[in-house]
Amino acid sequence: MPPKRRLVDDADAMEDQDLYEPPASLPKLPGKFLQYTVGGSDPHPGIGHEKDIRQNAVALLDQSRRDMFHTVTPSLVFLCLLIPGLHAAFVHGGVPRESYLSTPVTRGEQTVVKTAKFYGEKTTQRDLTELEISSIFSHCCSLLIGVVIGSSSKIKAGAEQIKKRFKTMMAALNRPSHGETATLLQMFNPHEAIDWINGQPWVGSFVLSLLTTDFESPGKEFMDQIKLVASYAQMTTYTTIKEYLAECMDATLTIPVVAYEIRDFLEVSAKLKEDHADLFPFLGAIRHPDAIKLAPRSFPNLASAAFYWSKKENPTMAGYRASTIQPGASVKETQLARYRRREISRGEDGAELSGEISAIMKMIGVTGLN
């Protein structure tokens, strides 16, 4: 119950109330804001000097040496060794040559916090062994897979499917035993380098360059595996809807708000395929701005129906964490469940559908309802 209003009997008090003035407004703010220190930066990785790539890589094969630098630095050096010309591309993209040290080193009165030299006085100039090269291949294969899929979680978890890609590559290079024995860097997981590269503004251009360059062997065999992973990577909505339209046998397809978006989806994807040709499957991996045209928000009802169907039919989607009903959708899960009880016909005569819905269904091979 709200408190009772107190009656004011005192005439002076009533007069004071009439004379009440609101407090003055706050003074205007000057518009200044906390500034970053001029010339300051967070600890960052580096790639050293181009002439030192091989010697730096040899040194960084040793864990104790890797531990001296920013955790991403060794991975970037291994990539520069793997792909000649990448060092210059990284420099063009703004990657520093100097790497921060994990712990500053004091020499006399000077404290060193970063350096572009990653090898020590005891590091010898030598060629890498085949097993060392294969170990660098393994590390970089996992790293680049994480970059094209836009996530480090599978690599951090050591997913078996990632290991299979490397084993397939080693078999193609006639070194099948290295699929099991190239383990010199197995304790150095590249997940931090994946996250760092995925956060750079040039990541899409980097992936595009990898996918469109004709590499000599063993680069060709290496990139064949990366391309297989990159194809339709980060395009889950598109691939799920395509599978739904091709394989669904229930009447959720005929819900009007879903059906009308099928037509839109087919038109948009056809236009994107025409515009991008062979690059269409890689729009997600190269972070092309057109990839957003295939996002759930473009077809919220169709995407909701497709995810609902896929979670019921596809075991690999059962653990998909995204919400079934997408933002902006008007279709409800109860409605999808009700329509799912009825089957459609593909290639056989079935019950008639309304004119406009029927025309849309014919686009995907649906001939009626059972």
Curated annotation (Swiss-Prot):
Chief location category: virion
SUPFAM superfamilies the UniProt entry points to: P40 nucleoprotein
UniProt motif (Nuclear export signal) ranges: 128-141
GO BP: symbiont entry into host cell; symbiont-mediated arrest of host cell cycle during G2/M transition; symbiont-mediated suppression of host NF-kappaB cascade; viral penetration into host nucleus
Acidic residues bias (residue ranges): 10-19
UniProt key word Cell cycle: no
This protein's UniProt keywords: Capsid protein, Helical capsid protein, Host cytoplasm, Host G2/M cell cycle arrest by virus, Host nucleus, Host-virus interaction, Inhibition of host NF-kappa-B by virus, Modulation of host cell cycle by virus, Viral nucleoprotein, Viral penetration into host nucleus, Virion, Virus entry into host cell
Localization, UniProt: Virion; Host nucleus; Host cytoplasm
Motif (Nuclear localization signal): 3-11
GO CC field: helical viral capsid; host cell; host cell cytoplasm; host cell nucleus; viral nucleocapsid
Location of region: Disordered: 1-25
Pfam families assigned: BDV_P40
Chain's role: Encapsidates the genome, protecting it from nucleases. The encapsidated genomic RNA is termed the NC and serves as template for transcription and replication. Plays a critical role in the nucleocytoplasmic transport of viral RNP by interaction with other viral proteins. The nuclear export signal is masked by the interaction with the phosphoprotein P. Delays the host cell cycle progression by interacting with the host CDK1-cyclin B1 phase in late G2. Inhibits host NF-kappaB activation.
Subunit structure: Homomultimerizes to form the nucleocapsid. Binds to viral genomic RNA. Interacts with phosphoprotein P. Interacts with host CDK1; this interaction delays host cell cycle in late G2. Interacts with host NFKB1.
Note: Isoform P38 does not have the nuclear localization signal, nonetheless it is localized in the nucleus.
Name of the protein this chain belongs to: Nucleoprotein
Organism: Borna disease virus (strain V) (BDV)
Lineage: Viruses, Riboviria, Orthornavirae, Negarnaviricota, Haploviricotina
